């Protein structure tokens, strides 16, 4: 086992604080409308330019192992805030640095760290309750656009694009961000249910210009197995031909004789038909077939539940107003499913989301909800260069997370004003002893840090601005973008309550742990000279020549 290097008490805390300051100082320059960019060197390709706090934090590793421990713990604050609310990472880092700095001063002055932590925790619990009381719902498109604009570094185009996307696909709709091909940002909205499976044969194409299969009022056959024998499909084909309507077959696969016969029938005009593979794999495929069945008022033909393909009747088939199939995607528009049954299915999937443990499962389940309940919107980010594209895509993703958080828990006045108001309301809080009171004061003082940093980044005097804002009431604050004072909500400077709450809670949690640290243990650096054994004795191998 490698030898360890151990530091105690003040020595440990000083080293830890040095690491905290290196990381926090690099991150906090990005805060606010006049925050600066940070350039990150990459081992390959062009450097990345970003204004995203968590992206900066993730890049920082320090040579000194004790300093690095401090930096990594604050990095955890940014990561947790990012995971919980998708934004507020810089605010969380600034709050953590302020609490740690003030807290360690109090510890150095002889205060009991455990009571300090209890005081900080009490202040944060009270502050979170006050934040919730200050919060106002964010339901209208204008407020959503304002939140998106602030989070995207005051880019109103991004804010409006996100608001439009949410308006079109609803709160439950999936909004994804992709790199576009043009210079301008674009919004692409897919109505209905779309999945990533295209036609199985180009001979199904009936819209030559678009290279797609367009089916009007089709029947939809859902099969949970491979279909290779045409005899299994004949009863369905005959029934559909009599009804003079097209047919879409969604199966695990359609191959061999079955696919060839379908192509021939389609080309001769006997029955208008197209076939696609079912989306997903394994259990997820079964679930998605069931989703399509609910959406189209059909049944999944599966031998597991005793339904055989040869005995299918028209009542087993789903229906939709229109289906469009391209080489890569299938879109079912306006399925015939009953709204109450669809909502029941959505509620069932939402319950699975709550029970899911992995982020991947949650994401896939959320996509299924969106396909059933709303739709899918794709924001295509436009930029002149690859470097700008990456930076802008980061900002758009941040803004998207912020707007989702705003819709979820409402909004408060932005620009650090909400924390100032909360601190003044909690100022009368009293702990169980004087050391807890110091902890409460540490937390309340730290709540001024975001507005001070926003002001510093704008090149103004932070103490003057902080005192002016404290003298005001309600949403009165400082707009760092214009240098004006006024009502932050009226000026459209809003922060999602969830983002502010998460930043405060995670910052206090990690800062409390660091304040109560008394010893730090790390591996001793290995002397590179002694890493390899002496190879000098190998010279004697020259005598082995006689073995030839």
UniProtKB/Swiss-Prot annotation:
Its EC number is 5.6.1.7. It comes from the Bacteria. This is Chaperonin GroEL. It catalyses: ATP + H2O + a folded polypeptide = ADP + phosphate + an unfolded polypeptide. GO terms for cellular component: cytoplasm. PROSITE patterns: CHAPERONINS_CPN60. Keywords: ATP-binding, Chaperone, Cytoplasm, Isomerase, Nucleotide-binding. InterPro entries: Chaperonin_Cpn60_CS, Cpn60/GroEL, Cpn60/GroEL/TCP-1, GroEL-like_apical_dom_sf, GROEL-like_equatorial_sf, TCP-1-like_intermed_sf. One of its GO terms (molecular function) is ATP-dependent protein folding chaperone. CDD domains: GroEL. Forms a cylinder of 14 subunits composed of two heptameric rings stacked back-to-back. Interacts with the co-chaperonin GroES. Belongs to the chaperonin (HSP60) family. ATP binds at residues 30-33, 51, 87-91, 415, 479-481, 495. Together with its co-chaperonin GroES, plays an essential role in assisting protein folding. The GroEL-GroES system forms a nano-cage that allows encapsulation of the non-native substrate proteins and provides a physical environment optimized to promote and accelerate protein folding. One of its GO terms (biological process) is protein refolding. HAMAP family: CH60. It comes from Aliivibrio fischeri (strain ATCC 700601 / ES114) (Vibrio fischeri). It is an enzyme of class 5 (isomerase). It is found in: Cytoplasm.
